[in-house]
Regions:
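Amphipathic alpha-helical coiled-coil segments
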Residues: 22, 53-67
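Short, charged, amphipathic alpha-helical segments
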Residues: 42-56
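Short, charge-rich amphipathic alpha-helices with coiled-coil/heptad character
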Residues: 1-12
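Short, flexible helix-adjacent loops and helix caps
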Residues: 34-41, 67
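Positively charged, hydrophobic/aromatic-enriched amphipathic segments
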Residues: 11-15, 58
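Short amphipathic alpha-helical heptad-repeat segments
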Residues: 17-33
Length: 67
């Protein structure tokens, strides 16, 4: 495997790890939503989802380059 492909694979893995953390954080916010301000929670959930979507798009783009 070329050095570039290994680097790209590590980028994909890092994105996957980050997505996992963001999804866990999002789930935690969902559990806490009854204890905190609902409008603030909605804002944070929306931001998390946007970040997750962006990271997934970047991961998919990198995977396409690797193939």
């Amino acid at each position: 495997m070329k050095k570039t492909q290994r680097y790209e694979r590590r980028l994909v893995e890092a994105r996957e790890d980050t997505i996992g953390v963001m999804e866990q954080y999002k789930a935690e916010i969902e559990r806490e939503k009854t204890r905190q301000n609902a409008s603030h929670n909605e804002f944070v959930r929306t931001c998390c989802q946007q970040e997750i979507n962006q990271l997934k798009a970047e991961k998919d783009a990198i995977e396409l380059e690797v193939v």
